Amino acid sequence: PDIPTDGMDRRAYLRAKFGGEARAQRGYAAIARAGISAGIEFNFDAIDWTPNTIDSHRFVRYAQQLGKGAEAVERVFQSYFLEGRDIGDRSVLVDIGAELGFITDRLDAYLDDTSTIQNILDHNARAHRLGISGVPAFIVDGQFSISGAQEPAVIGRLLDVARERQRELLAGEVTG
């Protein structure tokens, strides 16, 4: 949601976020290796435009209301990271919605209603306060977070830290 409304050239985005394409490529290479081990073949070269994702987030919220949130997230991610589609483009989101069996007129009406934008921006601001700056992101117990592609050991450590904090809190209640 922090990208300009119309999105931006991918190379300009990579320079701004990572300090250059070469640094981004090193990070993407690690993500690609992790993806291959999970059976996912990322196609970062197909991405030439970095979209503003507010409507993508709103699309997922709509899908959640229909009980298809997980499917919507997966299809949006596939569309962007595997197919290089512009997931900030309303017509792309409506096409994905049609694939998922949504009534596209209703989806269009939902996306036309701008009243849900502030909620997305509020969630984004909260994520930034928690230190989240990329996807995927994990928040445990509302206070511990990591973002971006992480090794399983890092995620395990996050869970260990949260578990230890819960033990400390429970011990304080018992003795306090």
Question: What is each of the regions a protein language model found here?
Answer:
Residues R61-G176:
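C-terminal cap of thioredoxin/glutaredoxin-like
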Residues P1-E83, L169-E173:
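Structural alpha/beta surface segment adjacent to cysteine/selenocysteine redox centers
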